[in-house]
Regions:
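Long all-alpha helical scaffold domains
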Residues: 1-17
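Helix-boundary capping/turn motifs
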Residues: 14-21, 84-91, 257-258, 277-283
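Polar helix-capping/helix-linker motif
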Residues: 18, 52-55, 87, 343, ...
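Surface-exposed beta-strand-to-loop junctions
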Residues: 18-22, 67, 88-93, 326-332
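Short linear interaction motifs
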Residues: 21-26, 90-97, 259-271
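Alpha-solenoid helical-repeat scaffold
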Residues: 25-72, 76-253
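Eukaryotic phosphoinositide-binding membrane-targeting regions
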Residues: 196-278, 283-450
């Protein structure tokens, strides 16, 4: 420490020289020149201190880390001042680390960014200071803006066809992954790898190639977006992305097909080879297989899947046959994404046999066109939520006005939810009052003409 005749600057300099561990911690948090190997363990140490349930008030006070005291003090003012004392250099180092996620050349892994966001939340809860709260919120907004600019190029130029699938998969990983200090993994003890052949999860290594870089940017965007919403004390009601406000058709619903184009076909489901007689229907978003109900013009839904997740192919040896695969929503992989990993389980693998090749061609054209339209709608809705716009476009938004007009999806069917199997729907009113059978679908609404 400085001598008796020295000023406050000498005392501060002497104190800084004696805090060897703290200075090493600050140096480790710098990711401007190197990778985040040291930064991860520095954040890991700080987060472990916050999560420690023991009595470490004196240690935290000496380290100038904000904390909630676990012991009563005689002087509440002194206790409050000690709890909320925070070295500004540490807070600035954390802010610079999170801000580095917006740079294109930064070697910051997703797991390190997630840990930094957790530590910043702990600081905000302990400090309870409006200025710190506003600084972190502004930091999250500026970082999210930088990430949005990088995602715009991927969404409209490099990966337009795959951007929907990549976002859905990374969003599932973001929602399911929970960081646990006791099972971090031995792979983090080694320097960060950038090779997909290492077998490491993408969030624990540096991305390689354009596709992995886009996925890592999406994951970083989701973490920074959550930090921003937490600082604003707001819920994220825009994710997951929805197209339109109307609910989707579900299995066992009863729908009015009076104004729909139906294609009769025989469905052979793989791998059981079960044969079913169905009618093929498609709206803006869904592929639907129905069977006739008890009333003319109505059908009971036996399968419903998203057109955006449907693949269609013909059979060279038979012009009446279509092969379809409808994939389910992405599932958490447990080891995150890597090349060749199966992220989706098919909901339906089937062969559709039509009466003739003309109906088969009509069905293929309808499904192919419907899939392209459904993916375009989902792409426009996703870009609207993420505030993405084409590179060089000064208009805010992710697509043309015609695309946004189509987001207000109108369900072409009159849907009765919850029909029992066999295309019947129980009515609340007695059948003797209206002369209808109790198990029949409801009557169509009567349009009054004046």
């Amino acid at each position: 420490k400085g001598g008796a005749g020295g000023g406050g600057g000498e005392e501060e300099q002497g104190s800084s020289q004696n805090r060897i561990f703290f200075n090493a911690l600050l140096s480790s948090l710098d990711v401007s020149m190197n990778d985040d190997y040291s930064a991860f363990f520095a954040l890991y140490t700080i987060y472990a201190i916050f999560e420690n349930k023991g009595d470490a008030d004196e240690l935290l006070t000496a380290a100038r880390l904000p904390h909630a005291s676990k012991r009563p003090q005689a002087d509440p003012c002194t206790r409050l001042e000690a709890e909320k004392d925070c070295d500004p250099r540490l807070l600035e180092a954390l802010r610079l680390l999170v801000g580095a996620a917006g740079r294109a050349n930064c070697r910051l892994r997703t797991i390190t960014l997630q840990l930094a966001c957790l530590v910043l939340r702990q600081f905000v809860l302990a400090l309870d200071a409006n200025d710190v709260h506003d600084q972190i919120r502004a930091l999250a907004e500026s970082t999210k803006k930088c990430l949005t600019g990088r995602l715009s190029e991927a969404a409209f130029v490099h990966h337009k066809d795959l951007f929907i699938d990549m976002f859905d998969e990374e969003y599932v990983e973001f929602e399911s992954f929970r960081l646990r200090l006791d099972v971090v993994g031995h792979e983090l003890l080694l320097p960060p790898s950038s090779s997909p052949m290492s077998g490491l999860p993408l969030n624990k290594r540096i991305p390689s190639g354009r596709e992995e870089t886009t996925r890592a940017t999406l994951a970083s965007y989701l973490h920074v977006r959550k930090l921003e919403r937490d600082m604003a004390d707001a819920c994220d009601d825009e994710l997951p992305v929805r197209v339109g406000d109307n609910p989707l058709v579900a299995v066992d619903d009863c729908i009015n097909l009076a104004n729909s184009d139906l294609l009769s076909c025989t469905v052979i489901v793989s791998p059981s080879n079960e044969r079913q007689s169905r009618f093929l229907v498609a709206d803006q978003l869904q592929l639907i297989l129905v069977e006739p109900a008890g009333k003319a013009g109505w059908g009971a839904v036996r399968f419903a899947g998203l057109l955006q997740d449907t693949s269609i192919s013909g059979e060279p040896s038979d012009s009446r046959v279509l092969h379809i695969v409808v994939e389910g929503p992405p599932r958490p992989s447990g080891v995150s994404w890597r090349v060749g990993a199966a992220r989706r389980t098919p909901l339906l693998q089937a062969k559709l046999i039509f009466d003739d090749h003309i109906r088969c061609m009509a069905g293929k054209q309808r499904l192919t066109k419907g899939r392209a339209g459904a993916r375009e709608l989902k792409h426009s809705a996703l870009c609207s939520v993420l505030r993405l716009r084409p590179p060089g476009d000064g208009v805010r938004g992710g697509g043309s006005s015609s695309h946004f007009d189509r987001l207000h999806r109108v369900n072409p069917f009159r849907v009765v939810t919850g029909c029992a199997p066999g295309s019947v729907r129980k009515q609340n009113s007695p059948s003797v009052l209206d002369g209808r059978e109790e198990d029949a679908p409801p009557e169509d609404p009567v349009v009054k003409r004046h």
